[in-house]
């Protein structure tokens, strides 16, 4: 599924947005209520997850994941927190582009259970991050266009990106994705 999605976008880029949910049963119920196809599912004592069909959701494969305990992240292994280092402290938000961002915003809003949002800004607010739906700006079609990252040291990140040739029009760009630092 991911490979076909990236082919449609003509190259590298982000293909999945993972959202940790508090109540997996409720989240899965919203998916079923909205008649969205599931392309992958797992049901383990410590983790449950479903990947929603990207053709129906648009923009990315949406993964709804539940962890037990909530602070864990099975996919990263049991010791993942001891490997956190560097100037990035978290994900602030994600921009998803579309030729019809209003419709995509509404579809995602409904599947996510109508959390706090701004219809004027086409922005969905989650616990400590956001999803923003914007007009296709690069002609690659629907998909992840940018990540906004929480960072401790912008200078060191920008310096390293410049050394690696990852600056385009003054912005960090990696694999077809723009990275903003906040």
Residue ranges and their predicted role:
Residues 1-4, 8, 181-182:
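Conserved donor-binding loop and adjoining core beta-sheet/short helix segment
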Residues 90-97, 108:
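A conserved mid-domain beta-alpha-beta active-site/ligand-binding segment of alpha/beta enzyme cores
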Residues 28-93, 123-140, 148-149, 155-182:
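Vicinal oxygen chelate
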Residues 21-22, 94-103, 150-151:
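Short, surface-exposed ligand-recognition loops at beta-strand->loop->(often short) alpha-helix junctions
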Residues 17, 108, 147:
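Terminal peptide-recognition signature
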Residues 10-16, 141-145:
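Eukaryotic phosphotyrosine signaling hubs
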């Amino acid at each position: 599924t991911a490979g076909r999605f990236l082919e449609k976008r003509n190259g590298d880029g982000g293909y999945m947005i993972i959202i940790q949910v508090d109540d997996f049963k409720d989240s899965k119920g919203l998916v079923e209520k909205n008649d969205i196809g599931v392309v992958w599912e797992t049901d383990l004592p410590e983790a449950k997850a479903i990947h929603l069909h990207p053709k129906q959701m648009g923009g990315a494969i949406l993964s709804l994941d539940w962890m037990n305990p909530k602070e864990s992240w099975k996919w990263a292994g049991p010791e993942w927190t001891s490997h956190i280092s560097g100037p990035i402290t978290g994900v602030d938000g994600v921009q998803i582009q579309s030729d019809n961002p209003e419709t995509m915003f509404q579809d995602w809003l409904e599947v996510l259970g109508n959390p706090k949002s701004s219809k004027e800004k086409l922005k969905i607010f989650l616990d400590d991050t956001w999803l923003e739906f914007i007009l296709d700006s690069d002609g690659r079609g629907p998909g992840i266009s940018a990540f906004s990252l929480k960072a401790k040291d912008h200078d060191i990140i920008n310096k390293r990106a410049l050394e690696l040739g990852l600056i385009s029009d003054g912005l960090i760009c990696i694999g077809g994705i723009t990275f903003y630092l906040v």
